[in-house]
């Protein structure tokens, strides 16, 4: 008897087959991006070729690892796992990694980064620095063993041997080269005494030159305070470093020529130019000064010199008058203050003097009362022993002792009995 399967049963059976198939666990596909519309997190699109289409899913974590922008119609190489989605019965690829297809992958990265940096304005002419005419010190960022540095040294020594070359040995190809190039550009800027910088390498494939297309290198060149000459690859090779550099040279020799003057010709031209500029400047200054003298000579002051002092004399008179008024006012004010103070001080001083006079009289009368002659006149006497000691009490004397008695009109000697 024939057994009919439900759609769900068949779909589950096929899903189990897909899940157990080791070949479908990791599939390598090539195709074009179709129906792509960027979403905030996970990405859903399709891969197609001339004969078929397969739905594709890429989770946010994997999508963030891409170093290029997905675009509609882009040919890519995808690696992922095939699975069936039961509710719709459709199969799809869950993409784990994705890169542009073939040599075009780097070309895509190049164009996308160029577009991004152009939008930011990094390649605009207004940012370009002028190369110095006479470079005393030149920084060179390149490989120490290539023909580039030899060509630069030879050219500089031939054209302008006074220039000093400082080499920053740099890896210019392969993994880590971009970091070294950018790092040495920044180190040269930190040193701060270079007039110009040459960066470059010899020719090669797009992969060989790719270090000079990395964003880290482009931004280091843009941020450089030292004018930079780019000399990367052959004349037909173009890198993003060429776009952002202040000048581009087709060869290392051409770069060295841009960095140095042609000693005889350029020095003569420079001297002639400086002479011409100096002459024009002096002529201009003399003209300005002559016009100023002519203008001054026509002024009223030069025609009537005495008028030069009119204003100052008037100002001096006004100041003298003002000083006189201020002095009179000051004296009057001080006199008034003196009179006010004197009016208050004299009555007070009189009272103080009278009080002191009365006090003095009282003290004088008190002293008169204490005068010994006055005391004697009132009938008192001063008794002393033979040693001059004043006798104050009967107990101070003894029988037979001789005493001196001072009276008002003289002294008598008595004996105690």
Swiss-Prot record:
**Enzyme kind, highest EC tier:** hydrolase
* Localization per Swiss-Prot or TrEMBL: Cytoplasm
Where is it predominantly found? cytoplasm
InterPro entries, A to Z: Exonuc_VII_L, Exonuc_VII_lsu_C, OB-fold_nuc-bd_dom
The question of whether Glycoprotein is a record keyword is answered with: no
Gene Ontology CC: cytoplasm; exodeoxyribonuclease VII complex
The record's EC number reads 3.1.11.6
Q: Which UniProt keywords apply?
A: Cytoplasm, Exonuclease, Hydrolase, Nuclease
**Its GO biological process terms?**
DNA catabolic process
Q: Which reaction does it catalyse?
A: Exonucleolytic cleavage in either 5'- to 3'- or 3'- to 5'-direction to yield nucleoside 5'-phosphates
State one molecular function term (GO).
exodeoxyribonuclease VII activity
| CDD domains, per the entry | ExoVII_LU_OBF
Nucleus in keyword set: no
Query: What is this protein for, i.e. what is its function?
Result: Bidirectionally degrades single-stranded DNA into large acid-insoluble oligonucleotides, which are then degraded further into small acid-soluble oligonucleotides.
Family per record:
Belongs to the XseA family.
* PANTHER family recorded: EXODEOXYRIBONUCLEASE 7 LARGE SUBUNIT
The annotated subunit structure for this chain is: Heterooligomer composed of large and small subunits.
The record's listing under HAMAP family reads:
Exonuc_7_L
Q: Could you identify this protein by its name?
A: Exodeoxyribonuclease 7 large subunit
């Amino acid at each position: 008897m024939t057994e009919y399967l439900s759609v769900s049963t068949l779909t589950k059976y096929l899903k189990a087959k897909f899940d157990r198939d080791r070949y479908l666990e990791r599939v390598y596909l090539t195709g074009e991006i179709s129906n792509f519309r960027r979403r905030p997190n996970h990405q859903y699109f399709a891969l197609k070729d001339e004969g078929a289409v397969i739905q594709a899913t890429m989770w946010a974590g994997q999508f963030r690892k891409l170093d290029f922008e997905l675009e509609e119609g882009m040919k890519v190489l995808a690696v992922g796992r095939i699975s069936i989605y039961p509710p719709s019965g459709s199969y799809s690829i869950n993409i784990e990694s994705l890169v542009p297809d073939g040599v075009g992958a780097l070309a895509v990265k190049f164009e996308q980064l160029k577009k991004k940096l152009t939008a930011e304005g990094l390649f605009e002419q207004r940012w370009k620095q002028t190369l110095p005419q006479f470079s005393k010190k030149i920084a060179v960022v390149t490989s120490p063993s290539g023909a580039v540095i030899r060509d630069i040294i030879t050219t500089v020594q031939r054209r302008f041997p006074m220039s000093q070359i400082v080499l920053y040995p740099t890896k210019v190809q392969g993994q880590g080269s971009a970091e070294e190039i950018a790092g040495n550009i920044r180190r040269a800027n930190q040193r701060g005494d270079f007039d110009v910088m040459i960066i470059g390498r010899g020719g090669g494939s797009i992969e060989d030159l790719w270090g000079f297309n990395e964003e880290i290198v482009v931004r280091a060149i843009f941020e450089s305070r030292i004018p930079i000459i780019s000399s990367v690859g052959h004349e037909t090779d173009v890198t993003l470093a060429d776009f952002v550099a202040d000048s581009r040279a087709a060869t290392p020799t051409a770069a060295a020529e841009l960095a140095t003057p042609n000693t005889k010709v350029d020095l003569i031209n420079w001297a002639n130019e400086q002479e011409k500029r100096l002459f024009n400047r002096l002529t201009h200054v003399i003209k300005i000064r002559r016009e100023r003298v002519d203008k001054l000579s026509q002024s009223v002051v030069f025609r009537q010199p005495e008028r030069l002092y009119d204003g100052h004399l008037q100002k001096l008179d006004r100041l003298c008058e003002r000083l006189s008024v201020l002095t009179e006012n000051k004296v009057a004010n001080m006199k008034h203050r003196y009179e006010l103070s004197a009016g208050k001080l004299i009555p007070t001083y009189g009272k103080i003097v009278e009080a002191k006079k009365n006090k003095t009289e009282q003290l004088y009368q008190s002293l008169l009362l204490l005068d010994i002659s006055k005391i004697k006149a009132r009938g008192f006497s001063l008794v002393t022993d033979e040693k001059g000691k004043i006798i104050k009490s009967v107990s101070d004397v003894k029988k037979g002792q001789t005493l001196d008695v001072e009276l008002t009109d003289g002294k008598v000697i008595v004996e105690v009995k």
